[in-house]
């Protein structure tokens, strides 16, 4: 039986005096169908949806319920997903979150928990981030990914939010020329704060509409800035507008598109692991990017997108098969350079350190008898802490010790399972941590 998220009233705004913060459109059966989804991720470039990729997405739901999440628009996906593609599903529901309060509404949370597949529509990724990050919505989505292996997909902004690193577009979009001229321009807003947790995309940033306009230069700038700010040699997956990458549970991405009739491609990009000194030569505020390394700073694999998705790329092994070409990318004083390249003779790896932007940290996780919670941006004396079960029950957890910026909690009384960690301070609630209790 699926969990129903009956969060206590203290978690929510009282809706009695407010308009409903969402609009729901249901096609098919309104009740819940319990199936076993197959997992996976569908990343789509942002123009018209690729029908073959969307059929893959629906098949991963295994006949279950499809949920479309968006903050603007209407029900344009409903008939398309329910009947036009010829894949049987139980229902398609679009929920338009018209207010940030929707992220706390019991109906929205229940429907998120019941979905076998969730599709993020295009739109404004900052709207998604600012409305859903650190709320029960993203906590439940991530729990369902981890527990039930639901399938996640999205186009344009809905693709842009799915990497462990992401371009938030908080101040608007940015062109390649602007990002190359100054990787620290106010429009280059990159983030790694916990949002959509896909393990295979943990050290990856995605980019969309990659050929309209050409975004190779800005992606180079993104990767350089991530290294400078986070100490991580991140990787990237980019889709041209009519291309999709559908990633199965083993981490293999099939590339869908219209090749050879149309020039549809996806790119898999990483720093050059063959170099002893791979870091950018100059990535500093107010200056043009230089990441040259003999013209071999970055390796990019271009894969043609076809109707049957026959050309593939293994993300764990960072190797492709089928119709593909390798390129070397570099940047010299803000000028992007592309030349023919070779496949890497090594597997790129990423050093990853906890983000300094995350306000809450937990160790260990999964946990057993004790768990240490600390905050590097909040005074523990001003914070109240809760651990809440999947059923919405607040668990009585005595603090063993209180430190200046954290607690050691006694968790022996908790049964094994998934819990939400919430902290309250200065009128704000943080729900960006999911805890797992293992058997003692």
Language-model-detected regions and their locations in the chain:
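Sec/Tat signal peptide C-region and signal peptidase I cleavage site
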Residues: 15-19
């Amino acid at each position: 039986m699926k969990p129903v998220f009956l969060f206590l009233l203290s978690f929510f705004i009282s809706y009695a005096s407010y308009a409903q913060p969402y609009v729901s459109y249901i096609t098919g059966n309104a009740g819940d169908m319990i199936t076993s989804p197959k997992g996976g991720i569908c990343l789509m470039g942002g123009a018209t949806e690729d029908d073959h990729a969307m059929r893959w997405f629906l098949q991963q739901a295994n006949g279950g319920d499809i949920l479309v999440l968006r903050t603007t628009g209407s029900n344009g996906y409903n008939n398309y997903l329910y009947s036009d593609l010829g894949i049987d599903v139980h229902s398609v529901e679009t929920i338009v979150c018209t207010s940030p309060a929707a992220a706390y509404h019991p109906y929205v949370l229940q429907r998120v928990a019941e979905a076998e597949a969730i599709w993020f529509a295009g739109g404004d990724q900052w709207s998604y981030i600012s409305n859903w990050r650190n709320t029960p919505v993203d906590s439940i989505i991530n729990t369902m990914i981890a527990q039930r292996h639901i399938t996640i997909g999205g186009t344009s902004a809905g693709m842009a939010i799915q990497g462990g690193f992401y371009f938030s577009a908080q101040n608007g979009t940015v062109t390649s020329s602007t990002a190359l001229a100054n990787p620290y321009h106010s429009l280059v807003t990159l983030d790694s704060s916990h949002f959509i947790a896909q393990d295979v995309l943990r050290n990856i940033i995605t980019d969309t509409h990659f050929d309209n306009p050409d975004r190779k230069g800005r992606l180079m700038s993104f990767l350089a800035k991530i290294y400078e700010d986070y100490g991580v040699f991140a990787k990237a997956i980019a889709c041209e507008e009519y291309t999709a990458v559908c990633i199965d549970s083993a981490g293999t991405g099939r590339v869908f598109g219209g090749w050879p009739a149309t020039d549809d491609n996806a790119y898999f990009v990483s720093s050059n692991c063959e170099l002893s000194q791979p870091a950018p030569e100059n990535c500093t505020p107010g200056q043009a990017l230089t990441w040259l390394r003999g013209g071999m700073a970055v390796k990019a694999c271009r894969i043609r997108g076809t109707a049957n998705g026959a050309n593939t790329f293994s993300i764990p092994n960072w190797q492709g098969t089928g119709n593909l070409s390798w390129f070397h990318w570099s940047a010299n004083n803000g000028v992007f350079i592309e030349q023919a390249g070779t496949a890497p003779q090594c597997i790129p790896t990423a050093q990853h350190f906890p983000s300094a932007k995350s306000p809450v940290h937990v160790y260990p996780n999964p946990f057993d008898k004790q768990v240490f919670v600390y905050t590097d941006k909040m005074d523990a004396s001003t914070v109240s802490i809760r651990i809440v079960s999947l059923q919405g029950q607040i668990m009585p957890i005595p603090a063993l010790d209180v430190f200046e910026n954290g607690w050691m909690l006694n968790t022996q009384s908790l049964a094994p399972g998934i819990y939400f960690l919430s902290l309250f301070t200065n009128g704000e609630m943080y729900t960006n941590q999911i805890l797992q209790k293992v058997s003692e």
